[in-house]
């Protein structure tokens, strides 16, 4: 099993070898904020490997702190309960400057916490990583409240205040509601999107940055302020905007223990340069760090590459480095509802011509991917605040937990590993159907909620607007004669698509019926193996992307 990582939230001041306090950081005028959180979470034991002793785990945290201080980078340390009650960690963390470092809670549930809450321990070890034992989804709502009360009371008795930030791979809505309503937490975080890794599936959510969750579903962004929990949930681990989606079960993130990603100097420089310099709508965010279970030897090289880059970017005014609570408080001051955001890549790693944009709003998310001169809309998921998560009132009894939204196009799950499918932009070229071929897209922002991609094709272009509730594609100056979108899937792929009804496509997923409706353009059946085809009207298609 892969050990999970600590958060690093990244902002428009991600790098500076200066002693300026975090709150004094500035971003360059006109730049959207780029926020980095460095988040390390701490476990007290590692029962799966006898060589990873308590001393090894403790020294890992000592080294993390030393490296962060070397580059004058603050951050957040999240304590699992067994580490919270270990006096060595208490004494160590109490020495950290409060204006640069934050102490919060890591919401995995070890034996001492469960038993102090008066609940029988069912685990094999004192820390058991299985979903039904070590996480809130394995306990009833009443048990969750007892567990929360014990943790928060003991945290306050040790540090003198309640934690402001609580994070975990997965947290249910009941627990988050209770933590906010009673203890007023200001920030949370959950795992990146993934399928099945370590028993956790989170798929189709707000892809990066942060969102206000529905009171009924901690993974689902709310559409209305009166239905949302006013605690921003940040997405963890710094996912590669191109490879992490295509390889949904693997790990291509800022985590420094992975030699192809966060432990690779070339990848680190590419990712952080892209993050800091490419266009973003609203703001951009990333998380870095690693849990101590991986040990210092495994993470040392990656962190020693990452930290000076973050410090340099902060000094240049391109990123902000903040604690998780600082980012949460900024988010709440800035946004009354979940904002629209993008993460764009205008230049991939060497030997790849891929470009991409992830767009998120409180109504949907989408991903556009350019490869070999062609365009594919790999992903569209709708959000609906009335759809509860599976664990709002129920528990999981297996070592798996599942959090989904509502898929209209799911290129990863409906394609093949490493080769996502989705809506392909096609044309009739006289000799048959072929992908439209074009140049490099240019990403800009039209306003606070609308991102734009301009894709040159022939003597014309396709102009793509991603708005809060709609996606518009317009052909300017006849870039391609007879063009259309085909929703392609791999042979044998199972999808929730049911049928075309009028000018909409009907879907049913997890007992919820929803649809893709057309404001402009027409839907028709396709004879080439795709689910259906979208044809333009007057050179334009407009997809309505709000679940009604």
Q: Which role does the model predict for each range below?
A:
Residues 50-58, 78-90, 111-114, 167-176, ...:
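Acidic-and-aromatic substrate-binding clefts and catalytic sites of carbohydrate-active enzymes
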Residues 449-496:
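Acidic, contiguous internal or C-terminal segments within carbohydrate-active enzymes
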Residues 259-266, 286-289, 485-488, 508-548:
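Beta-strand-rich recognition/accessory modules
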Residues 26-99, 285-287, 358:
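Active-site beta->alpha N-cap acidic-glycine motif
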Residues 368-450, 458:
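Acidic-aromatic substrate-binding/catalytic surfaces of carbohydrate-active enzymes
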């Amino acid at each position: 099993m892969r050990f999970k990582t600590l958060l690093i939230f990244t902002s428009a001041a991600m790098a500076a070898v200066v002693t300026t306090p975090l709150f004094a950081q500035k971003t360059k005028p006109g730049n959207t904020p780029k926020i980095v959180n460095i988040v390390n979470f701490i476990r007290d034991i590692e029962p799966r490997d006898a060589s990873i002793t308590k001393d090894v785990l403790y020294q890992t945290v000592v080294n993390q702190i030393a490296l962060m201080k070397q580059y004058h980078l603050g951050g957040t340390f999240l304590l699992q309960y067994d580490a919270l009650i270990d006096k060595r960690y208490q004494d160590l963390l109490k020495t950290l400057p409060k204006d640069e470092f934050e102490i919060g809670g890591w919401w995995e549930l070890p034996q001492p916490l469960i038993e102090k809450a008066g609940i029988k321990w069912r685990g094999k070890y004192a820390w058991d990583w299985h979903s039904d034992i070590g996480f809130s989804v394995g306990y009833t709502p009443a048990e969750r409240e007892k567990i929360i009360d014990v943790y928060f009371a003991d945290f306050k008795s040790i540090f003198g205040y309640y934690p402001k930030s609580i994070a975990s791979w997965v947290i249910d809505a009941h627990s988050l509601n209770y933590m906010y309503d009673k203890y007023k937490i200001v920030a949370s975080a959950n795992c990146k999107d993934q399928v099945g890794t370590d028993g956790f599936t989170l798929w189709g959510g707000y892809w990066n940055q942060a969102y206000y969750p529905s009171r009924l579903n901690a993974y689902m962004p709310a559409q209305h302020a009166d239905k949302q929990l006013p605690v921003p949930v940040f997405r963890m681990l710094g996912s590669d905007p191109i490879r992490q989606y295509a390889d949904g079960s693997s790990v291509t993130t800022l985590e420094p223990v992975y030699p192809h990603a966060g432990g690779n100097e070339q990848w680190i420089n590419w990712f952080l340069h892209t993050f800091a310099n490419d266009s973003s709508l609203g703001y951009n965010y990333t998380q870095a760090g690693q849990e101590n279970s991986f040990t210092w030897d495994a993470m040392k090289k990656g962190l020693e590459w990452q930290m000076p880059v973050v410090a340099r970017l902060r000094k240049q005014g391109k990123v902000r480095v903040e604690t998780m609570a600082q980012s949460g408080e900024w988010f709440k001051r800035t946004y009354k509802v979940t904002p629209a955001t993008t993460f764009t890549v205008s230049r991939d790693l060497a030997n790849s011509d891929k470009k991409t944009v992830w767009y998120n709003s409180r109504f949907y998310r989408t991903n556009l991917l350019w490869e070999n001169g062609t365009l594919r809309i790999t992903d569209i998921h709708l959000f609906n605040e009335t759809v509860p998560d599976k664990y709002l009132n129920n528990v999981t009894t297996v070592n798996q937990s599942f959090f989904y939204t509502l898929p209209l196009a799911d290129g990863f799950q409906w394609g093949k590993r490493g080769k996502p499918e989705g809506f392909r932009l096609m044309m009739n070229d006289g000799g048959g159907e072929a992908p439209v071929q074009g140049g490099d897209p240019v990403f800009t922002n039209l306003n606070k909620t609308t991102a734009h991609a301009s894709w040159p094709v022939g003597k014309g272009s396709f102009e793509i607007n991603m708005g809060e509730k709609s996606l518009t594609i317009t052909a300017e100056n006849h870039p391609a004669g007879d063009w259309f979108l085909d929703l392609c899937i791999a042979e044998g792929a199972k999808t929730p698509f049911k049928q075309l009804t009028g000018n909409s496509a009907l879907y049913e997923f997890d007992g919820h019926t929803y649809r893709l409706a057309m404001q402009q353009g027409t839907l028709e059946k396709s004879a080439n193996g795709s689910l259906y085809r979208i044809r333009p009207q007057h050179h334009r298609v407009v997809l309505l992307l709000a679940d009604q």
